[in-house]
Structures are given as structure tokens and as C-alpha cells.
């Protein structure tokens, strides 16, 4: 499919109108939100998938992604994997840290695919 107007830049998630006869995009509806990395638009939720260990949770990457999501009013779901590789105490300390520092601003789902926990 081609874009009729060179000034239109279509990205994943865009709602478009197109001419079926000419097989071209004729317009792009106003985006409700969009992210630069990855380039997406009209996002209802964003799921962030991080492991708690191996590799360890990268708080800097997480904060950058969270800030981008909040700037665009996109609700966040955080999935924490590999919880079977840490003790219950370590997991609880980590979850308490997230909840206290981020004031319960997103949903957290701890999972373990190895032990079939949270799936």
C-alpha cells in the first residue's frame, strides 16, 4: 500500500483511510498517543517485561520506559519474570520497593514460566 501524500508518515497503530481502487492511504486520523522507541501509536496499554534476575532488573531502562508511557497517558502493566530464582523474601522486598517508590502507578504481575506461577 502506498501513501498518497508524501507529508503523511504512517506508523504502527495508526488508524488510516485508504482508497481501495488506487490502493493508497489518503489520510491518517489524529493519534491519541505515540511512542518514539519503538515507533507506535494509538496504544491502549503497554506491557513491560523484565526479569528480576539473570539478567537483573534494569531500573534505568524501566524508568525511561515508564516516563515515556506516562507522558503519553498509556497505562502500564509490569511483568516480572524468573521469580522462582529468588527467595520469597527477596521478591517481597523488590515488590515493596516498586510499590513504595512508584506509588502503585501500574499493575505488577510476578511470574515464573519454569514453575508455572502467575500464568
Q: What spans do the regions from the language model cover?
A:
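N-terminal accessory targeting/assembly segments
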Residues: 1-59
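Context-gated lysine
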Residues: 2-7, 23, 30-32, 64, ...
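Noncatalytic linker/hinge segments flanking ATPase motor cores
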Residues: 22-24, 69, 87-92
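Conserved beta-strand/loop subsegment of P-loop NTPase cores
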Residues: 43-50, 70-83, 102-112
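Residues at alpha-helix caps and immediate loop-helix transition turns in enzyme cores, especially N-
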Residues: 58-61, 90-91
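Histidine-anchored nucleotide/phosphate-binding helix
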Residues: 60-73
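Canonical P-loop GTPase G-domain recognition
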Residues: 84-119
